[in-house]
Regions:
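Accessory RNA-recognition modules of RNA-modification enzymes
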Residues: 1-184
């Protein structure tokens, strides 16, 4: 069974429903096929598997949306979801649909805490999130890079100018997350 609760809807992981060993075999076969199709005699070394299949990515980019994707489970719940702003990954095959995620197993902390903080901070202040169709909204993307040294780089892409809110957000991020060494 997939470990991630967002698996199957989110576009972040695609093979979590099969064993890690099988995942790497499939990827290796795909690489071999692609390269040997062009270079017949190419020697392809086997994939070196990671010790841990989770929290291995050093960089992720999350998208903000003013109309988050609701899962079938959410739609079937009968619950009204008046707050539609969110931050997460695009639904596979949809450039304008984003699944709001609260936990991603791809990148180590403080990735989840940072994403959730920025999303919640902006919602509490009623800041506009990006709409891919109209190309309007303040918060557009959040890129987080976590180095093996523990240093963190954060880049927030703002579509609209709200200088006072931007400066307040960046100041609060720097204060709450001392591991951030670069913040833009």
């Amino acid at each position: 069974d997939p470990t991630c609760k967002h698996f199957g809807v989110c576009g972040g992981c695609k093979l979590q429903n099969i064993s890690y060993h099988t995942q790497t075999e499939l990827k290796e076969d795909k690489i071999k096929h692609s390269i040997t199709r062009i270079f017949n005699d190419a020697k392809i070394n086997p994939i070196i598997r990671c010790d841990n299949q989770f929290f291995y990515r050093n960089k992720l980019e999350f998208s903000f949306t003013d109309n988050k994707w609701l899962t079938q489970e959410q739609l079937d719940s009968g619950i009204d979801f008046p707050e539609r702003r969110g931050a997460g990954f695009h639904i596979p095959g949809f450039w304008d649909k984003v699944l709001d995620i609260d936990e991603c197993l791809l990148q180590p902390e403080p990735s989840n805490a940072l994403r959730n903080f920025v999303r919640d901070w902006a919602i509490e202040r009623d800041m506009p999130f990006f709409n891919a169709r109209s190309q309007e909204g303040w918060l557009r993307t959040l890129m987080i890079r976590v180095a093996s040294t523990g240093e963190v780089l954060v880049v927030i892409q703002f579509k609209e100018e709200h200088a006072e809110a931007r400066e307040e957000l960046l100041k609060e991020l720097a204060g709450k997350f001392p591991e951030i060494t670069t913040l833009q």
